[in-house]
Amino acid sequence: MSNVGALLLCRTRPESVAPAARLLRDRMLLAPAGDAWSVLLPEGRPWQRGGEPVDRVLTGWATALAVGAPWPVLALWWDADRAGFTLVSGFRRPVGYVWLANGTPAAEDEAMRTFADRLGLDPVLDVQDLDHLTKPDPGSDARARLRALIAVLTRAGVTLPEGIAPGEPADRLREAALALPDARPAEWQGRREAVPAELDAVESSRLGPWPPWSGTPLACALALAQVAAGLPLMAWGLRRRSGGWTVAGALLLAHGAVGLAYDLVWPWD
């Protein structure tokens, strides 16, 4: 059994995650993870297909989900040598932390404080507990560090479903997820189904309702910038065969295309 695994935590309800999750083009299981959180679990091991490390695959997925969305995405991953997380929130630079297999911190302390700030965690109690995770601790390996991170996040409303725990192999996580009564698939269904899903993702995002429909020069400029950023990002993802980065570029391109189309049909006066 492979000891590589991963999961994605989204700070919103499953019905808000589903439209964007379907665009990842990988079989996923989606379940509630608290009152205002959802968890996405890959059904397979996509990092084995393209030869990319699990952390890069998960960062691409998190970026694709969080681009323009009003909710952040936290990717947790682990393999034989390391474990860590990446937090993506809108167009901000992702922030993450890594531990070696024996639990040795391998990142900057400031990253953990930025993580706490972006999630709105308690600046005293939560930050103090997170700071402990940046200090050497011979009794805690990398996977114990991830479990301690989840313990802190329970105070922010995270409640992982039964059997879903960081550090477990992907196959075991999949078995546990399939046994959950409220888990459901969120998977790629083909290009025809992707169009409405992509539009749903645009509509539900932070950028969806505002710029395209405002009919201002700012909206047009933003749409052009999104197209300019989305095309090379999508091309880079296709060259690297990275589904997450490809979808991130596609979503940016979709945002921009919607804005430009609206500007052409209803030009600004």
PLM features per residue range, with description:
Residues M1-R22:
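Short, extreme N-terminal segment that most often corresponds to the first beta-strand
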Residues P46-D269:
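Charged, compositionally biased boundary regions
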